[in-house]
Curated annotation (Swiss-Prot):
Encoding gene per record: rsmA
GO cellular component assignments: cytosol
Annotated protein name in UniProt: Ribosomal RNA small subunit methyltransferase A
Reactions this protein catalyses: adenosine(1518)/adenosine(1519) in 16S rRNA + 4 S-adenosyl-L-methionine = N(6)-dimethyladenosine(1518)/N(6)-dimethyladenosine(1519) in 16S rRNA + 4 S-adenosyl-L-homocysteine + 4 H(+)
The organism's taxonomic lineage, starting at the top: Bacteria, Pseudomonadati, Pseudomonadota, Gammaproteobacteria, Pasteurellales
InterPro entries per UniProt: KsgA/Erm, rRNA_Ade_diMease-like_C, rRNA_Ade_Mease_Trfase_CS, rRNA_Ade_methylase_Trfase_N, rRNA_adenine_dimethylase, SAM-dependent_MTases_sf
Group of enzyme by EC: transferase
Source domain of life: Bacteria
Amino acid sequence: MSNQNSKKHLGHTARKRFGQNFLHDMNVIHNIVSAINPKNGQFLFEIGPGLGALTEPVAEQVDKLTVVELDRDLAERLRHHPFLNHKLTIIEQDALRFNFREYFESLELKEGEGVRVFGNLPYNISTPLMFHLFKFHDLIQDMHFMLQKEVVKRLCAAPNSKAYGRLTIMAQYYCQVVPVLEVPPTAFKPAPKVDSAVVRLMPHKVLPHPVKDVYWLNRVTTQAFNQRRKTLRNALSTLFSPEQLEALNIDLNARAENLSIADYARLANWLYDNPPAVDNQEEIIDEDI
């Protein structure tokens, strides 16, 4: 089989720049839809419907579904779908730049209601897209995403592990994180070079460790995990003196992965009250988020 044919599915050639890998294993699809458990009357929103592997079985169970798709060819296919088109609201836009708050608020959600978001996310944008969605956690009931297996491990990680990092802390700050199922490369066309997994993210109704400004939580976790091999005495030296860390009950010889979310929230709130005179925001290194 030619390389071009191996990337083609249902007449559409996967586009590398969009990170497209199309799900086609019916058992996996069934298990994902069962995990989502869509119900009529719920507000369902799919990111990256692609060729409709999840769109079709979800839409069969509900009267309406909103999807956001960047690929104009795929959006056009959905507009002309033989039995879904009347159920779909299709937004042809980049999900990373989409104003979810404006759209979700336009739905006039009742108290206690939230949007149910799901999707087989392009792996090249999955982490920044989740960070984008966390901003709208108060309007979301839950999220079910297909991700790279290693990313799911990081989302679910506990302190004192290699997988524990900035992504862990920010995800668990906003959400309860539950792994759902693992998915082999053979479930996709073209097959990715990595294993995949599905995760459920359920935003907390009340944040367990609230911070006064999430900027400082981002700030302190970025600096700590960008230098995760250093002790916190050294990694956070531009933000805290050793005496200040000790006063906040932080072990000076601990490293970034040793602190809990509650510890980082305490550091963030102290920085909010005592911001450094000069705040040289460090560049975020993808491998540590």
